[in-house]
Amino acid sequence: MSSSVTNKSLDSLTLSAVSINGPSSTASSTHSNYTTQHSNQDYFSIKPKLKVSISNEISSTRSSEIIPGNPLLFSPLDCTNSEMDEEDDFEDDEDDENLGLINPLHHKSSHGQISDYSPLTPFTEPPSASLSKPSFTSHSPVSENIDINLVIRRKSANPATYNFLIVDDNIINIKILERILFKLYPNCNIKKLQDPTKVANAIKTHKFDVVFLDIEMPEITGVDISREMRQQPVFNSVGIIAVTTRTMAHDLLVYETVGIDYTFAKPLTYNYDFVMDRIDEVIRNRIST
């Protein structure tokens, strides 16, 4: 009798154990399958759709904005000096990054495609969103907070064979301005001076269309050079443009008083079309005087 009771108790315990372990294993298996299924779904279906959506949006924007050979979308970084070959131009583009030159049309994405977006601009923002042209006043340099999308060019390079003189005691500043000028005026001739005391002899032995002057230089300043040039009528046809960090209102008034035609603020983050327009305007005004 006791043996029968004991067997029944053992059987009931065994059944209880099975009933407890069985559903647990099934629930665990179901949860595991659910997790795996949804994690795979999240990774293989949701994320690729997001990437494709962004890619399609960018591709449609590119096709409408970047048209090879279209002069309305000319980039000065695609214009090279006649003496530079394709390999040199590629090296120059790397130098642009080292010198701080920024051009969204030459920014390459991780897929090797040319992008007209600045690395600092979200991909969701269309390029045309900030193409509104700011208003400028005489001797008022464009704000250093200018939207980098404005660097997109709408004009072709100027083929004129202008003669430019750059005077700056900092060789890096000279190289930056020199490269910008060659992009805008590929046929121009540029003379560079780090020693401002040599300017007097240079302007007597060479004819320049525009002299670009740093203001703060040792021994003789850009203001002194401009004042001396304007005191000699022979230099009335020569344009003078200051390239400086000193752009306060009282500084600009002094520059205008001594005969400086225009002022670009450092760093040179201007729209290339704007730079060309200002230089051309200075040259036209000086020729007519």
UniProtKB/Swiss-Prot annotation:
The modification 4-aspartylphosphate is found at residue 214. The keyword Transmembrane helix does not apply. CDD domains: REC_hyHK_CKI1_RcsC-like. SUPFAM superfamilies: CheY-like. Residues 127-136 have a biased composition (Polar residues). It comes from the Eukaryota. This is Stress response regulator protein 1. Required for stress adaptation, morphogenesis and virulence. Signal peptide: none annotated. Residues 83-98 have a biased composition (Acidic residues). Residues 163-281 form the Response regulatory domain. Residues 77-136 are annotated as: Disordered. One of its GO terms (biological process) is phosphorelay signal transduction system. The keyword Phosphoprotein applies. It comes from Scheffersomyces stipitis (strain ATCC 58785 / CBS 6054 / NBRC 10063 / NRRL Y-11545).
